[in-house]
Amino acid sequence: MKNSFIYKFTNNEPLIDNILKKYKMEEIIKNPYSLIEFINLDEIDKVITNDKSFNKLELKSNRIRAYIFECVNKTIDNNHTAVLKKEIFNYIISKTNADIEEISIANEINILVDDGIYLKKINEDFLTTKYYYEVENYILETVLFNSEIEKGVILNQAELEEYMNECEIKQGFKYDTKQRDILKYINKRKNINFLNGYAGTGKTTTAKGVLDLYSKYTDKIICAAFSGVASARIKHATGYKSITVHSLLNYDGEKFNRNEKNKLDYDFIFIDESGMTDSELFAILLNAIDFRRTEVLFA
């Protein structure tokens, strides 16, 4: 009789086999909303709502949590790592036709946050998952720490001035004050630098100047971008080898083979389109860089 319970939700035998590999039937009976990993939540909720044999009051907490998980996961699927609490309230109220009050939703959110297993509070308005909270904290700490480390200049002051003057002659126009300041700053060999600016502000020219500057120190240089098109554009504009970030990290379709135990073998890495890289990939990239030897410019 217990096994017949699951047929209330699906008669797909292969799906049922997969469900029972993960959950015991007793667990499913106790919380049928755990089936959201396999079955659409609206379908689960419809069965429970229309079946008088279910104790709706006992399942209320699990129901709310299921909708919280669904809302947060949909937000993440849309490439956002944080979700407004208010959006969760609105989502659940809309999906349940105002059958659940805000105070109950707030209570379940607070319990999940206090639990610390799934949800983390960013501030009073925003939430994220524990996973992305840890990923983005790792990024923040790594960037802040390495942005302060200097390994010593590539060229002395006189040599750098001569280098910039030579670049201006070769390219046929002068660097503006900001571009010269950037080259002076990057000459200090900080572990991490960022190059910001809108299209047409001279980022590519500055990046070319940085790459040529580093070429005086090492030939272990690589450029990478999120997309193949951007990667090809960098190669055309700078003359340096350029690949996608996935290729840089030696992605084989299942895993990234450049990682904490197998660091990238470069002295200088230029990453364009870094703003298009999601948090997870950005963290994987940082983890694969050996900052004892490597400096990175993100643009």
PLM feature spans:
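Conserved ATP-binding/catalytic motifs of P-loop helicase motor domains
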Residues: 1-299
